[in-house]
């Protein structure tokens, strides 16, 4: 076939005596007499077009990313990132969620962040261990009453309740002494496992009750006389 186009004067036998006409009629026009020249021009024309059509660098990156990140169901189009990173960054996460989120180009900032994350986790773990290992001594806690426990309750102070034994001993002491000295108050607090403040408040309330009872029994006495009588007694 190629030899036929190269040599246009190749003799061809036709029926009916038309051989002379075939030799006189040219196969190509005057502009395309040489078939080899025609094909060479076409090749140079195609090469020139290919050289003139230049694609930007982002086009190749998009096509490469589309081939890598393409999914079966069809995914969102890839966006060009001038920094050169094709990964989804989430706040507070040190590892990638899946294989698709792994970066194609890892920057220096990303490497530093991966190094800092284990250090932060180690420091947080050490601080938690330090808090859990701290010792709490008895003198560091509030001491309200011995009946509530050896270290007392650290919550809000409520109404103090006394046992029958404590109330009986306090009534005996009040019968003999309506006012207590500091030394006697310390002795009673150690004996009854109470604080000095609790004993002081109990004696104040008991004196108020005793005054009301005496006032009902002896309404003629004035408060001054009652106080003098209490001091004398």
Curated annotation (Swiss-Prot):
For this protein, the record's SMART domains field holds: HOX (SM00389)
Q: Which UniProt keywords apply?
A: Developmental protein, DNA-binding, Homeobox, Nucleus, Transcription, Transcription regulation
Ranges of compositional bias, category Acidic residues: 224-233
Point out the DNA-binding stretch(es): 155-214
Q: Which residues cross the membrane?
A: none
> What's one GO MF term for it?
DNA-binding transcription factor activity, RNA polymerase II-specific
Which SUPFAM superfamilies does this one have? Homeodomain-like
Where does motif Antp-type hexapeptide map? 136-141
Its main localization is nucleus
Listed GO CC annotations: nucleus
State if Zinc-finger is listed as a keyword: no
Question: Region (Disordered): which ranges?
Answer: 213-233
Q: Which GO terms describe its biological process?
A: anterior/posterior pattern specification
Protein function: Sequence-specific transcription factor which is part of a developmental regulatory system that provides cells with specific positional identities on the anterior-posterior axis.
Q: What is this protein called?
A: Homeobox protein Hox-B6b
Q: Which organism is it from?
A: Takifugu rubripes
């Amino acid at each position: 076939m190629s030899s036929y186009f190269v040599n246009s004067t190749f003799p061809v036998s036709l029926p009916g005596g038309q051989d002379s006409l075939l030799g006189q009629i040219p196969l190509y026009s005057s502009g395309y007499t040489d078939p080899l020249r025609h094909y060479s021009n076409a090749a140079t024309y195609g090469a020139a077009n290919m050289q003139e059509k230049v694609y930007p660098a982002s086009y190749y990156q998009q096509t490469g990313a589309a081939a890598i990140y393409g999914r079966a169901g069809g995914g969102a189009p890839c966006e060009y990132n001038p920094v050169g990173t094709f990964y989804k960054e989430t706040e507070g996460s040190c590892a990638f969620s899946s294989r698709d989120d792994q970066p194609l180009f890892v920057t220096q900032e990303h490497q530093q962040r991966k190094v800092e994350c284990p250090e932060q986790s180690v420091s947080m773990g050490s601080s938690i261990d330090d808090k859990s290992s701290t010792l709490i001594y008895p003198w560091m806690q509030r001491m309200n009453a011995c009946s509530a426990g050896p270290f007392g309750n650290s919550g809000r102070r409520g109404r103090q309740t006394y046992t029958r034994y404590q109330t009986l001993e306090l009534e005996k002491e009040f019968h003999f002494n309506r006012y207590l000295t500091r030394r006697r108050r310390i002795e009673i607090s150690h004996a009854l496992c109470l604080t000095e403040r609790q004993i002081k408040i109990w004696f104040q309330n008991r004196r108020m009750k005793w005054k009301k009872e005496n006032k009902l029994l002896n309404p003629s006495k004035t408060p001054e006389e009652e106080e003098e009588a209490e001091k004398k007694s």
